[in-house]
Amino acid sequence: MVFMGKPQNRNRENIAQVLRRHGIAPTHQRIEIAHALFTRREHLSADQILKWVNSRCAETSKATVYNTLKLFLERKLIRELVVDPTKIVYDPNTEPHHHLYDVVSGRLTDIPADKLRVVGLPPLPQGTVADGVDIIIRTRPQT
């Protein structure tokens, strides 16, 4: 994936080129949403993306943000992480990796895939194969 690896500044023209390569028409709003995701290198919720985009350009609707995130997911530009039943965030890093989730602050931190080893999987339903393993280690301050 083009945006993975070391964080880099991405200008809007580079973002537009990446969107085109993935078969996505680079509208102004899609470019701004991608800019929020790929320049900040954070795990952002749809509401955080909406707020960030609207603070920098003309009003973007919540529906536009959700539809764009869905499109980016389908084209594998981002990953969706459900960190708890009430919180979904979007990850611009599509390379294999895992996460630490601080349940108090809500902060997610990437764990490189080579720092955590999965020894085995349970038996899978007949006719299926594993498509990936996502591990979220939830932490809280010691008391």
Regions found by a protein language model. Give the residues of each.
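A short acidic, leucine-rich amphipathic alpha-helix
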Residues: 48-54
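Short, Lys/Arg-enriched N-terminal segment that forms or immediately precedes the first helix
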Residues: 11-23
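Basic amphipathic alpha-helical segments that dock to polyanions
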Residues: 65-72
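Short helix-capping/hinge SLiMs at alpha-helix to coil transitions
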Residues: 24, 38-41, 55-56
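Short, intrinsically disordered or compositionally biased N-terminal tails of bacterial proteins
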Residues: 1-10
